[in-house]
Amino acid sequence: AWLVRRFATTTLPTVASLSTIRAERSEAAVRRNPFAGIGAPVLGVEIAAEEAVPPPGSDFFRGMLSDVSAVRSLPSLPQTGPELRQLAMALGAGEESLHLAGAATEANVKALDLSSTSVVAFATHGLLSGELSGLAEPALVLTPPDAASPDDDGLLTASEIAELRLSSDWVILSACNTAGTDGRPDAEGLSGLARAFLYAGARSILVSHWPVRDDAAARLTTGTLSRIGEDATIGRSQALRQAMLSLMEDENDQSLAHPSAWAPFMVVGEGGH
């Protein structure tokens, strides 16, 4: 806790990646859409996020595609919709910026023009490679279709994310374990979803190291963006640090002072403003 009380920190996948990230600033910055929020997928029973992933033996694939009925059986995340709405409000974005429930599909995400969107946020389940039987790479869970196809089987994988066209200042992943590896035996941390979003064109990403509490994740993401909305000069890492301190010092819920609540998230990439 002493580190976050004194410093705001940012992580880079590699030192060389910093020059690439800064080179990706484009003229699109002057004509940006402020926000796109994707999440609250239509899934099964409601349950706390940290209890949401089925056991590793669950069979989630039929051939190369996911079993959409199995994806649909994943627990729903009722707080993710309100969380994304709060993020939109913090950036002055309207309801049209939100792609929730039935609109939060893999096909819709691939069809969206996100190339001029400043902040893109996903609020859903994050899956590690191998976490479900047959899952060869990390993925984000979206609303599954009636029938799986190569373009949409309910799982937006790291390789599919890398093919998106982004020029976002920030991608926020309000999901579990999004700082994980790409699944190779010798893979390093951040080589999965984080690297995929950087490759797609994000300058910075908010990722998590372990399963996150729904309530804490929502407060951290909305608190971070609210601080940036109030002070355009504040950096992303500093805004996250202040949101973490707010949780740690909450006298109404002392469980939030435990690092398991406030510490999973970190900024990867460009931590400034």
Task: Cite the ranges covered by each PLM segment.
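Catalytic cores of enzymes
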Residues: 1-273
